[in-house]
């Protein structure tokens, strides 16, 4: 029986690496996967999922208005899918998370979602909110703060490396723009 998984973490915990490894494991056994990523994140090129350790895969891109049932069923009819893997799932809409539950419940294809839990102000992303509510399995991927504690929050940095307290929820960037920190340091940077 298929399930909906949400693998979440702060930045730099290996979410994309884990997604690419899972896809590889299926493919190595002769099974087809569909790798998807949000169109808003084009750091590694449009239609690519890439890891900081240097591995990458082509991916089908989705925007917040796309119907994932249509996209996935079309891919399933073309290549019988054994698994769907979604990177940057924090950018999913509520309706799209609901559509992924349909893929799992009605079409019986496992869906593995990978993304951030919260933004740089400690607020849930929409996709993460509904995945936390509706996923069958929640898996936290861990990374560490500069102090050695588990990092479960993210802070945004300006061009000079200073922590930003305000701004748009979504600003695409990597290590130059974000730092994963523990809640204690998040509190010092953002709340205090």
UniProtKB/Swiss-Prot annotation:
Instruction: Say where the protein is mainly found.
Output: cytoplasm
Q: So what EC number does this one have?
A: 2.7.1.21
Gene3D superfamilies recorded: 3.30.60.20, P-loop containing nucleotide triphosphate hydrolases (3.40.50.300)
Active site per the UniProt annotation: 88
SUPFAM superfamilies in the cross-refs? Glucocorticoid receptor-like (DNA-binding domain), P-loop containing nucleoside triphosphate hydrolases
Residues engaged in binding ATP: 9-16, 87-90
What single Pfam family name could you report for this chain, choosing any that match? TK
Q: Say which enzyme class the record assigns.
A: transferase
Q: Which GO terms describe its molecular function?
A: ATP binding; thymidine kinase activity; zinc ion binding
Indicate where this protein resides in the cell. Answer: Cytoplasm
Q: Domain of life of the organism in this record?
A: Bacteria
BP GO annotations: DNA biosynthetic process; thymidine metabolic process
Q: Name one GO cellular component term.
A: cytosol
- Per the record, the coiled-coil ranges are none
Provide the binding site for Zn(2+). 145, 147, 182, 185
Keyword annotations for this protein, in alphabetical order, are: ATP-binding, Cytoplasm, DNA synthesis, Kinase, Metal-binding, Nucleotide-binding, Transferase, Zinc
Q: Which reaction does it catalyse?
A: thymidine + ATP = dTMP + ADP + H(+)
Give the InterPro entries listed for this entry. Answer: P-loop_NTPase (IPR027417), Thymidine_kinase (IPR001267), Thymidine_kinase_CS (IPR020633)
The similarity comment for this entry is: Belongs to the thymidine kinase family.
Per UniProt, subunit arrangement is: Homotetramer.
Give the protein name, as stated in the record.
Thymidine kinase
Supply the source organism for this entry.
Shewanella oneidensis (strain ATCC 700550 / JCM 31522 / CIP 106686 / LMG 19005 / NCIMB 14063 / MR-1)
Q: What is the lineage of its organism?
A: Bacteria, Pseudomonadati, Pseudomonadota, Gammaproteobacteria, Alteromonadales
